[in-house]
Amino acid sequence: MRKRQQSQNEGTPAVSQAPGNQRPNNTCCFCWCCCCSCSCLTVRNEERGENAGRPTHTTKMESIQVLEECQNPTAEEVLSWSQNFDKMMKAPAGRNLFREFLRTEYSEENLLFWLACEDLKKEQNKKVIEEKARMIYEDYISILSPKEVSLDSRVREVINRNLLDPNPHMYEDAQLQIYTLMHRDSFPRFLNSQIYKSFVESTAGSSSES
């Protein structure tokens, strides 16, 4: 009996899996999970090389993380910021300086969220709107995100409803709430910070030299 089984095993060719048919073991089955490293919204390094000629929305959103290009403001303009938060927020140089201060308070995500919402408002392509809306949610609204902004339950409910049919203005309530928070909470401390005072002095010195 043992010899018969041995002869059968010898007669059966071993089935080897071709290298080309092997399934990659880095496949993830949770592509919708915010904390997953292979999220469908994440641009992998190898994909960046293959799609170098095609712009990606992730790259666009990541560009918000970079300080904005701007011209040097005058001393009068910098001083006027202390009287008008709206005016400072409309000036790229003002936003950059305010952002530098927020970073020291570990609340930079508030301004980044506001900028992302402003970027979303400019979009008209429905597919791009859906992708950017989802990315904003994952980056700043989701409780799983380290950059989650502080919003009340009413605003969160509005956002969750809007996610069913995203539109460029779906985060307006949340954006206004964060804008008000920065104005009332962070802005007064910013004006008393060394960052702002030093910038005022430097611009005043530049104006006197010219």
Swiss-Prot record:
* Highest taxon of the lineage: Eukaryota
What Gene3D superfamilies does this protein's entry cite? Answer: Regulator of G-protein Signalling 4, domain 2
Region spans: Disordered: 1-21
Q: What does the UniProt record tell us about how this protein is modified after translation?
A: N- and O-glycosylated in synapsomal membranes. Serine phosphorylated in synapsomal membranes.
Question: What InterPro entries does its record include?
Answer: RGS (IPR016137), RGS_sf (IPR036305), RGS_subdomain_2 (IPR044926)
Nucleus as a keyword?
A: yes
Which residues does the UniProt record annotate as the domain RGS? 84-200
| Tissue expression as described in the entry | Predominantly expressed in the cerebellum. Also expressed in the cortex and medulla. Weakly expressed in a number of peripheral tissues notably spleen, lung and leukocytes.
Please list the residues that carry the modification Phosphotyrosine.
137
Keywords from the named record: Cytoplasm, Glycoprotein, GTPase activation, Membrane, Nucleus, Phosphoprotein, Signal transduction inhibitor, Synapse, Synaptosome, Ubl conjugation
Under Gene Ontology molecular function, one entry of this record is: GTPase activator activity
Key word Ubl conjugation present in the record? yes
Return one Gene Ontology term, BP aspect.
response to amphetamine
- Which PROSITE patterns does its entry note? RGS
One Pfam family name is RGS
Taken from the UniProt entry, a GO cellular component term is: neuron projection
Location of this chain's protein in the cell:
Membrane; Synapse, Synaptosome; Nucleus; Cytoplasm
Fetch the PANTHER family from UniProt: REGULATOR OF G PROTEIN SIGNALING (PTHR10845), REGULATOR OF G-PROTEIN SIGNALING 17 (PTHR10845:SF196)
Annotated function: Regulates G protein-coupled receptor signaling cascades, including signaling via muscarinic acetylcholine receptor CHRM2 and dopamine receptor DRD2. Inhibits signal transduction by increasing the GTPase activity of G protein alpha subunits, thereby driving them into their inactive GDP-bound form. Binds selectively to GNAZ and GNAI2 subunits, accelerates their GTPase activity and regulates their signaling activities. Negatively regulates mu-opioid receptor-mediated activation of the G-proteins.
What do we know about how this protein assembles, alone or with others? Interacts with GNAI1 and GNAQ. Interacts with GNAZ and GNAI2. Interacts with OPRM1. Forms a complex with mu-opioid receptors and G(alpha)z/i2 subunits, including GNAZ and GNAI2; the formation of this complex results in mu-opioid receptor desensitization. Interacts with HINT1.
Protein name per UniProt: Regulator of G-protein signaling 17
Organism for this UniProt entry: Homo sapiens
